[in-house]
From Swiss-Prot:
This is Secreted enzymes activator. Residues 1-10 have a biased composition (Basic residues). Keywords: Activator, DNA-binding, Transcription, Transcription regulation. GO terms for molecular function: DNA binding. Residues 45-60 have a biased composition (Low complexity). Residues 1-26, 45-101 are annotated as: Disordered. The gene is saf. Increases the production of several extracellular enzymes, like alkaline phosphatase, amylase, protease or lipase. When present in high concentrations, delays the production of pigments and sporulation. Residues 55-74 bind DNA.
Length: 101
């Protein structure tokens, strides 16, 4: 094959708009269906959907974390208490005074 002919065929191949076709179609459909039967993906999806539906029926679908912005937020001192925060301050002050840290 001459140099000119090789260059023309390479140009034709690389300028293709559509990807090369698989001779017998894609194996994804059978592979995906096989995988879902092995892993139980469809059963898990059905369980999740029914769980969401039951939680939505009681009104807790949004969960406790998604509170409106107008709700009161808890201060850090309410979580830890005054004793734990003062101990931390003393510990850090002590290490700085000893020259360690």
């Amino acid at each position: 094959m001459s140099r000119r002919r090789r260059r023309a065929s390479a140009t034709r191949r690389s300028a293709a708009v559509s990807p090369p076709h698989t001779p017998y179609g894609s194996g994804c459909i059978s592979a995906c269906s096989w995988h879902s039967t092995i892993t139980g993906h469809r059963a898990q999806t059905r369980l999740a959907a029914s769980s969401r539906a039951s939680r939505a029926a009681v009104g807790s679908f949004d969960g406790a974390k998604n509170r409106p912005a107008s709700s009161r937020r808890q201060a850090a001192s309410e979580c830890q208490g005054p004793a734990s925060s003062s101990r931390a301050g003393v510990r850090w002050a002590g290490t700085a005074a000893n020259g360690r840290g």
